[in-house]
């Protein structure tokens, strides 16, 4: 009887073995995590974070490539510092501007930093970190041309697609001949080739271009345009715990002086608000900075002297 039962149990064991193996394999497959799931799990544990961050590589001085194709710029250095502060392992990749938010929500990467303004429309589909920079928008035209912001009706004007500058043009100057481009560089090319009469961009990027050989014959037309969407933030998927981690790291960088050091190395001042004014145009002789981390851009006073 015992032999019979043992034999029967042995047969069952032999029959169950493949099934058990299959179930173990299935369980292993179900327990395997995507890179995004790994990031989320790491965000709530002591394991090192592995974060993939996308940027646009033609938005100087925020993020662009050097002669060797290496990503450099203000945002790249800021990301390096943020990741070091979080003790995270970060990979920064280049992504076309129009693909940043779709790619983020498709889980191709975990965050996007590319001079992206925090707008109500974007906040509907992504979540932003606390602002890390503020900048207005400007109109650039050829020196000697009398083009103005108020005189854009019927005029061909360039701007990069899906930016605050292009949105401003479409909302406030829909009667102008708006030309939209996938990259800022292509907008500059059409300006210098004469295919458009003016170009509108964020202030820092536009001023940086005016300092180049290609921009030497161009100038800012009129005053800086301030909007409610001038704050830049890092974009994440909604509900991602990485938002809180990046906000904490950013606050710590501001407290320990690293943020001021990085910002100052690019914009000549440790104050983000002052940076908007300090990079403005040649002729700025003095910049008065209010020593307040929450200072508004309007609190920065620049005295300009015209060169005869």
Predicted regions and their residues:
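Short helix-initiation/N-cap motifs at beta->coil->alpha
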Residues: 76-77, 91-102, 144, 161, ...
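Acidic, polar ligand-binding/catalytic clefts
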Residues: 76, 84, 89-151, 219, ...
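Extracytoplasmic small-molecule ligand-binding "clamshell" domains
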Residues: 37-115
